[in-house]
Amino acid sequence: MGDVRYRDVNGDGVVDTYDKVALGYTNIPEITYGFGLTAQWRSWDINAFFQGIAHCTFYIGGTAMRPFSTGNINQSAINADIYDHVWKTTNTPEQNLAAYYPRLSEAGGEGSTNNNQTSTLTMRDGRFLRLKNFEIGYTIPKSILEKTFIKSTRIYVSGSNLLTFSKFKLWDPETGSSDGGIYPPLRVFTIGLNAKF
């Protein structure tokens, strides 16, 4: 109960390794791209850089699907979205019919090998587009600085890793991690001042 059932792809009446087929792409993106935008209006300027990948697939597995695995029992955590959508003995029959993920199992325990096969159940689209860098600045007009010893001054605010557009919502898709156990790129904000004397 609560285990994954696989399709007999070759139709020989037995589900085994001969039913395995290629799925999706590799976890190394076939396409990596980036583009920038720059705009200036009067004393204001804006710079943005976007980066993304496409034709990339990764699979949910590891401690995301086996949080009780040997050696990890005291240090693993389970993603709340996965936990909320797994088959559980405490669920009602209706809840279990709607469960997206199989029951959680301990490594080496009943169902652990079956439920952790690479399949379309755990395959995820790894493509994303990210606003990697964004900066907005204001250059103080020279007419204001005329009577000072400052030749020019620009004030700016910038940020890194501000927005990510992706179908995958469990953790940062840029990590390429199968269990979310890698730190994502940090979101950083900076306020600065450039001055020439």
Question: What are the roles of these predicted feature ranges?
Answer:
Residues S43-N47, S143-I144:
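Repeated loop/turn-to-beta-strand initiation elements of outer-membrane beta-barrel proteins
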Residues A48, I155-V157, L193:
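Membrane-embedded beta-strand positions of outer-membrane beta-barrel proteins
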